[in-house]
Amino acid sequence: VVLVIDCKAMGESAAAIAKGFRDYDPEVNFGGVILNRLGSANHERMVREGMDKIGVPVIGAIYRDDRMHSPERHLGLTPVTEIDPTEAINTIREAVEKMVNLDALLEIATGAPTIELPDAIDVKSIEKRVKIGVAYDEAFSFYYPASLAALEEKGAELVYFSPLNDSVIPDVDGLVFGGGFPEMFLFQLSSNESMKESIRQANAQGMPIYAECGGLMYLCESIHDFEGSVYKTVGIVPANCVMQQKLQKVGYVTATAKRDTLLGAMNTAIRGHEFHFSTMEPTIDDFPWAFHLEGGRKPQSYDGGYATKNVLASYLHLNFAGSDEGAQHFVDTCATYKAQK
């Protein structure tokens, strides 16, 4: 193990952190540290002196450089689809080449035991039973690659489309709307009437539609932005989404289905992550809540999400790679829909 320590505003106290990690579990092969975000040569000297006292090798020392910085906004890092990371990547590469002892790093790496991995599944060899449309553009880009691969392993051919730029959904048997930043593209999304209408028609025909977080927001009747302006969205979820100034939910939760959903039968429990600034406000009294959720950074218990026979939309970010039954059930439901078209 090589520990990377953020040394900003630290001197020899960085050595206490290194010592704690090194001594906490004697079975871990602790190879050394890389000092990150140093402010000057004098700063580096002070931190190195602390490491020398406890006998921890310093593999490298990286200085602070704003060119390495990734821009952020209310939900964390700005997606790579909106920025050109070339300068940051080149700056990091040059710093590592100059300031990290790569020979020592490789020697540590080659001394590690071999990691046994299962044979990768060749998704191209799997018979494709259904086509699933995946919304992917600047507004919807929060996907775990392994999660999408899990759908392919169950026999789905993924067809990517853009709710921002395309006029209609593709010819598919199911739809997936991932998370993202729809609130940053509200004018474009709300103005694309033909796209919204094609989604409404697909819903009316019973097409399975699965949505997470930003996808949920887009499927609601409207989104209220940070300034209070209202933008009409798809409208298949009877609720409005309202952006709030403070973070509403963050953390891993267990979601237990309150009814049958696209991911499984009632009482099926799944694990996922929530992180959102908006609230969903139902516009009907008898709202079909999808899940009862428990957990989060500040543990809570509450109902969330929307579920009908063919729609499941919630703030939950799910990795299908860790929910094999959910992936299977969704693809099977798409196959049933295809057979009945």
Cite the ranges covered by each PLM segment.
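Inter-motif core of Ras-like GTPase G domains
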Residues: 1-8
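Internal gly/pro-rich beta-alpha loop/helix module
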Residues: 11-124
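Phosphate-binding active sites in nucleotide-utilizing proteins
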Residues: 128-204
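Solvent-exposed alpha-helices and their adjacent loops that cap or buttress functional pockets
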Residues: 22-28, 49-54, 124-127, 167-169, ...
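Cysteine-nucleophile active-site neighborhood
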Residues: 158, 182-262
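Hydrophobic, well-ordered secondary-structure elements that form the walls
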Residues: 175, 212, 234, 275, ...
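Short, solvent-exposed amphipathic alpha-helical segments in soluble enzyme
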Residues: 18-20, 48-52, 147-153, 191, ...
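C-terminal and late-domain segments of enzyme folds
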Residues: 126-128, 140-152, 157, 243, ...
